[in-house]
Amino acid sequence: MQPDSPARIPGQSPEPLSDELIDFASEVFDVARRGDAAMLDTLLHKGLPPNLRNDKGDTLVMLASYHGHADAVRVLLEHKADPDLRNDNGQTPIAGAAFKGYKPVIETLLAHGADVEGASPDGRTALMIAAMFNRVEMVEFLISKGANPDAKDANGFTARDAAAKMGAPDTAARLAQASEAKSRPPGV
């Protein structure tokens, strides 16, 4: 299979794809990576499936999110792309944006219904990913949007635990504050 060949086209049977279609799909994935919102809009209006996936299960939203292109993400979501589709590794677009530190992308995803608590199969959330890489602004923003600082992954670790394990003292401290504030009775 060629790099970025579409492994799956939603709603269609798995038929062999022509080399021409594979080359076209590869170009489309590059358009998402580059964040060319106008070209994506044109292609979507012409019938491009908004949830097109490559051979790794990455959607156009995932690729645009991971590369920090909020306008491209917005266009895809306005064409009914699913903001929570995971790739073959179980990663969500919001987790990819949190890893890279792209707050405008996360804002766009959340404004279009992405699950702030959407977890990968190992239970890791976007908050945990941001915490691991000491992205304080991301951690604060995700908490302000409802991310649970006390959520645990499949191994029983919280975002604070992940931050401490990765040597991310700033986010570990911020998460400790958030956890304490959450456990305090209202008005105290």
Regions found by a protein language model. Give the residues of each.
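Ankyrin-repeat-protein effector appendages
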Residues: 1-28, 144-145, 154-157, 161-188
